[in-house]
Amino acid sequence: MSFYAAANPNAIPAPHIEYRALLPMLIVFGVACAGVLVEAFVPRAQRALTQTVLALGGLVAALIAVVSNTGLPRKLVAQSAIAADGPTLFIQGTILALSIGALLLIADRSIGADSDFVAQAADLPGSEQERASVQAGLRQTEVFPLAMFAVGGMMLFPAANDLITAFVALEVLSLPLYLLAGMARRRRLLSQEAAVKYFLLGAFSSAFFVYGLALVYGYAKSVEYGDIATALTASDRGDSLIIVGLALIGISLLFKLSGVPFHWWTPDVYQGAPTPITAFMAAGTKVAAFGALLRVFFVAFGGLAWDWRPVIWGVAIATMVVGAILGITQTDVKRLLAYSSIAHAGFVLTAFAATTRASESSVLFYLVAYGFMTIGAFAIVILVRDGDGEANHLSRWVGLGRRSPLVAGIFALFLLAMAGLPPTSGLWAKVAVFTAAYQGGAGPLVIVGVLASAVTAYYYLRIIVLMFAQEPAVEGPTVAVPGALASAAIALGVIVTVVLGIVPQPVLDLADKAVPFLR
């Protein structure tokens, strides 16, 4: 106790901050702030390289910090606002690894001058200012600090131990993504439409979260997860105040992970956003949202499991069915992958509904496998191009296996992983979640999941047949040669997908060792 505190017993004590436990997030947010300063003070010609080195270096340093923290005791830090436990470290490490892959795609500018991002975000589509910016060779580098802020929010979201911290994290990860979604160079109006839709629906989602937070506080007199759980055990669990509050918070979380019926933004945003940003959102945001969902429902509202489990069952079934059936009708490869991500969210929810330790670890493993196959798949989408940008219509992919066997083969590998076929990580990911769901008493969900997997396998295999079993068009698309950074991102996805398909046990053991969540 300081002399001032001893002399003033009514003084507010200074908070004790465990900087070692917070170091990974501090590094990421520090790099994001440094990136803003780079935009202000570094000459334009040097910004791209500076931002790339700064961002990649920061992500690697943060990942090293996460690994170094694995030996620390599990405890609540930052005045109990953040849980420094096994799931936090596992999810943060996954987010950082996926962010490195996504940032490699964002930084790669080898396919034409700024083929993915508009030269100046403020330029109107088709305007003279936009043409002048392109002719001047201007490069959009604000994406780096924006992406780093989003990564920081993704890391904080599943680590939050109270609803206010979770809401702050939700906004920190969401606001940069609203901007990044509108920065596509090609199809500018579609990109800006995607950004507006994402922003408006995201604002409604945030409003639901805040309203639910207020109701939960009115019931529990606290926003800390542990205090909420204690209040549930000490009073009437069926109180309408807590039920409505939980429902509103659940809606906000299901929106972020594209659960039905809160999924309608996903195809439009995935299609309109720059493809590297789509990969970043599809992988990183879903991992962070599921991590937050696990902590909120298992730690804070575990006492209401009998109330929310039937709802999760219904959402999981609807999510798998909608993602599988509507995916069949898609002719745009990015929209197809969007519905694929919706179906995958349903598969993860089957294990989540089991509410067992095995379900927690299986969800963590699935998120790792899904994230890397998604990054790799969108990286391949960037390479298949027409004169006006990416060739996203499936008719343009006909015969791709004969034009570029390597690119088509790698894309086929990622599709097989999404279908859950050997020898890929997708097989063991689905085995893990379906086994956990069955053992947890969610057998009907497993049946629906297997049937939905068969339907999704159809549209994955349909693309493979298009690429390898049909003759290419005379004037087909070109396949760009990826630069070193994009090649590294693709290689990362391939390596993780294949290695986890052959030797999944080390990561399964790591996920099992990470759980349970600190309560």
From Swiss-Prot:
The chain crosses the membrane at residues 22-42, 53-73, 87-107, 141-161, 163-183, 198-218, 242-262, 287-307, 310-330, 336-356, 363-383, 406-426, 442-461, 483-503. Its EC number is 7.1.1.-. GO terms for molecular function: NADH dehydrogenase (ubiquinone) activity; NADH:ubiquinone reductase (non-electrogenic) activity; quinone binding. Pfam families: Proton_antipo_M. GO terms for cellular component: plasma membrane. Disulfide bonds: none annotated. It comes from the Bacteria. It is an enzyme of class 7 (translocase). InterPro entries: NADH-Q_OxRdtase_suN/2, ND/Mrp_TM. NDH-1 shuttles electrons from NADH, via FMN and iron-sulfur (Fe-S) centers, to quinones in the respiratory chain. The immediate electron acceptor for the enzyme in this species is believed to be a menaquinone. Couples the redox reaction to proton translocation (for every two electrons transferred, four hydrogen ions are translocated across the cytoplasmic membrane), and thus conserves the redox energy in a proton gradient. This is NADH-quinone oxidoreductase subunit N.
